[in-house]
Amino acid sequence: MACTNDGPNKYPEIVSVKHLFQHSGSKHEFSAGKRFSKSIGKIFKRNSALKTSRTETANHKMELKKREGVTLLPPVPESLLHKLNSWLETFSSTKNMKIEENKIVINEKEIRDSVSYYPDKNGGSAVFCYLPDLVLYYKPPIKVTGKQCPIKRSPWESMEIQYQKFMYPLERLERQFEEVPFRPWYFAMRLKELYRCCERSFTNAANRGKARLLRGKQRTKKSYHKTVNLVSAKISTHSNAPSPG
């Protein structure tokens, strides 16, 4: 490329295109094109840095899971937290109720629906045994006075159906039970005692006093202790019993 100076008698000066563009680039360093290219470069650098940090964080989480068994979950939405808090408040208020004695109720509808929630809308609780499809539904509070046991009005027929279906081998133990013949509702009462005394030893549970039975009958500490051992042994050795927890 040739260009002339101001004077008419001056010789033309040779300037290369490359030199011209280098010159203009140095003069117009903050042009729009230059700023655009710089911003693009910054974006790519930032993305690469983010990818590196994300990879390091993911590797760290995987190491935590392998090393300490930590389960990392996504953040919980506020609506779910609100529901959880309300449920915990209901649970704590129900748990803090002072109940002297519980009435065991076998509810046909609750058994059909396979109750799995605690506490329910009526203030009771549903407990799953280790035996298949056997549900004991406890509804508080009923105090046993010793004159008449309110359990006799409960629908025990549904309990018999569930009992005969899944626990028929226990009929062989009928002669080993003292004072009271072997019945499904009686087995339910023994299970209730097991759940009430789950954190105590069987000896302490037997020494708390004579266990009240239906129609004012009572069992001795020795026979009660024997019954608890028989029932607990049968629960732990049942063929279809799922592992607890």
Swiss-Prot record:
One annotated Gene Ontology cellular component of this protein: prospore membrane
One GO BP: ascospore-type prospore membrane formation
Alphabetically ordered keywords of this record: Sporulation
Function: Involved in spore and ascus formation. Required for the efficient assembly of the precursors of the prospore membrane to a continuous prospore membrane.
Protein name: Spore membrane assembly protein 1
Organism: Saccharomyces cerevisiae (strain ATCC 204508 / S288c) (Baker's yeast)
